[in-house]
Amino acid sequence: MRLDAITLEHFRNYAHESVTFDPSVNVIVGENAQGKTNLLEAAVYLSCAKSPRARTEKEMISFDADAARLTGSVFSRGRDFTVEIELSRGKRRKMSVNQVPCKRAGDLSGVLNTVYFCPDDLLLIRDGAAARRRFMDLSLSQLRPRYDAALSEYNRLYDHKTRILRDAEEHPSLLDALPDFNLRMAQCGAVLIYYRARFCKLLADYAASAHRECSGGREELTLA
């Protein structure tokens, strides 16, 4: 599995840029604020339609543009893939793999897997639970399509429930729908908790082994 090339149009500070990667190791160098991290972000976004940095899609669209397009040429599972994602202000994003439209981000699972590490990852330890959930969401969405589907549905229900509570003062009858929303959110939440617990268990085993090797067996790392 490898990313052979990437083309960006109006993504972050890239008006139009195409980059071809070597099949082995690639080192990206440049001055500050030249777009090195933006390029890595684009690669991650092509893998799972989730950004490790942006909280909203419009943050990734250039200030002077209405839409952004990302295209990745990927070799995976013995064949070539072209992954395309289009982001638009005020419109739903469009995704496709080999020109076949994707209905949800989980449809990208398994085409390109990425591992993103940056200095901000120290927030996993120093910051609150939100940073750790974001890390797990980004990782699990690439590995388990069912997790990504449950996460998308949970967020949709959460947003809808928030609107109900906001408008209930003027329309009290909206509150009648809350029990159904609570049940469906609990069902999606159970799926998320199940996968997160399994992920933490596997990560704890690998992390303990790696730390044991780094410390010469003098220290034992545990995750909880």
Regions found by a protein language model. Name each.
Residues 15-16, 20-21, 44, 53-61, ...:
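Phosphate-binding site recognition
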